[in-house]
Curated annotation (Swiss-Prot):
Principal subcellular localization: cytoplasm
Species classification: Bacteria, Pseudomonadati, Thermodesulfobacteriota, Desulfovibrionia, Desulfovibrionales
Keyword terms, alphabetized: Cytoplasm, Lipid biosynthesis, Lipid metabolism, NAD, NADP, Nucleotide-binding, Oxidoreductase, Phospholipid biosynthesis, Phospholipid metabolism
Pathway(s) per entry: Membrane lipid metabolism; glycerophospholipid metabolism
Name by which UniProt lists this protein: Glycerol-3-phosphate dehydrogenase [NAD(P)+]
CC per GO annotation: cytosol
Compartments reported by the entry: Cytoplasm
The keyword Oxidoreductase is assigned to this record: yes
A single GO BP: phospholipid biosynthetic process
Keyword Manganese found: no
Function: Catalyzes the reduction of the glycolytic intermediate dihydroxyacetone phosphate (DHAP) to sn-glycerol 3-phosphate (G3P), the key precursor for phospholipid synthesis.
């Protein structure tokens, strides 16, 4: 199968590598011509994964038409806040009844749309098939063939079973689920909680605080998910609990790094400038905070992170307020 991968960051590159290793014909669509030349000549993505070698059959291009020519599947690994514009640009080049798999994690700030909602709006009338790939998966570990398990959400169970074979190779194992909404929300909301975990660790609050944040963060993810039509059980799986634990504890997590840097006294602007790759959780915090108010869902950790990130609240004050909330049953 020929697959076009849109997004030349670390995750798009790692998935292109995985698919090529699984005997797929992979073209990686990137923004920068210099980056494309380096990938094609040296099999290295110098900007995002400089220390690992891409599969030799991965081809990079900056040309949309070249990437999508003959492709039977489009894999989108583009940051959520730019996702809609890229999909709009690519739509005229898609084949009839396209298969689109998304591997980005976030919620649009402007329209409060999830990834699946953006695809449904932009590909309306195309007869497209949609799936969402999510779970605990640092790109560099996938590149190094370290054991990894993820989940692919697809409303049609038979299609999900077919696609999970395409996205499984070596020590990379893909499960399938029909709960697309749960899979995409777990991947998005966990980034908000990861910022909180990084902040708590950076302030020296200890392991107890981190465990509490992860556990109560999972409750927030589940409450919002159920309010938006997801199954609560999905959040106990790889795209929920799995991704939450990894992102809150692993120092390769960009969102955890945001919290750690804020704890050092950096401003959000300084943190953003210091990071080469996008930390989706900063924008997602704003979107989730607005959704929670609209749906009347209680998300205290998210609310605290919104106040810290977007209202300038002192992080220590935010934590004190969280811990002094009215007592209740778990």
């Amino acid at each position: 199968m020929k697959i076009a991968v849109a997004g030349g960051g670390s995750w798009g590159s790692a998935l292109a590598h995985l698919l090529a290793a699984n005997a797929c014909d992979v073209t990686l669509l990137v923004r920068d011509a210099v980056q494309a030349r380096r990938i094609n000549a040296d099999h290295v993505n110098p900007d995002y994964l400089p220390d690992v070698v891409l599969h030799s059959s991965v081809r990079a291009t900056v040309d949309d038409a070249e990437a999508l020519d003959g492709a039977g599947l489009l894999l989108m690994a583009v940051p959520c806040q730019h996702f809609r514009k890229v999909l709009q640009r690519l739509r005229p080049l898609l084949p009839p009844e396209p298969v689109v798999v998304c591997a980005n994690k976030g919620i649009e700030v402007e329209n409060l749309c999830t990834v699946s909602e953006v695809v449904a709006q932009e590909l309306e009338g195309t007869g497209h098939t949609f799936a969402m790939l999510s779970g605990p998966s640092f790109a560099v570990e996938v590149m190094r063939d370290m054991p990894t398990a993820v989940v692919l959400g697809c409303r049609d169970a038979a299609t999900g079973r077919r696609l999970r074979h395409i996205f499984s190779y070596g020590l990379f194992r893909t499960y399938s689920s029909t709960d697309v909404r749960g899979v995409e929300l777990g991947g998005a909301v966990k980034n908000v909680i990861a910022i909180a975990a990084g902040l708590a660790d950076g302030l020296g609050f200890g392991h107890n605080a981190r465990a509490a944040l992860i556990t109560r963060g999972l409750a927030e993810m589940s409450r919002l998910g159920v309010a938006m039509g997801a199954r609560a059980s999905t959040f106990m799986g790889l795209s929920g609990m799995g991704d939450l634990v990894l992102t809150c504890t692993g120092d390769l997590s960009r969102n955890r790094q945001v919290g750690l840097k804020l704890a050092q006294g950096m401003t959000l602007e300084e943190v953003t400038r210091s990071m080469r790759m996008v930390a989706e959780g900063v924008k997602t915090t704003e979107a989730v905070h607005t959704l929670a108010a609209r749906l009347q869902v209680d998300l205290p950790i998210t609310s605290a992170m919104y106040d810290v990130l977007h209202s300038g609240k002192n992080p220590r004050d935010a934590v004190r307020e969280l811990m002094s909330r009215e007592l209740k049953e778990e």
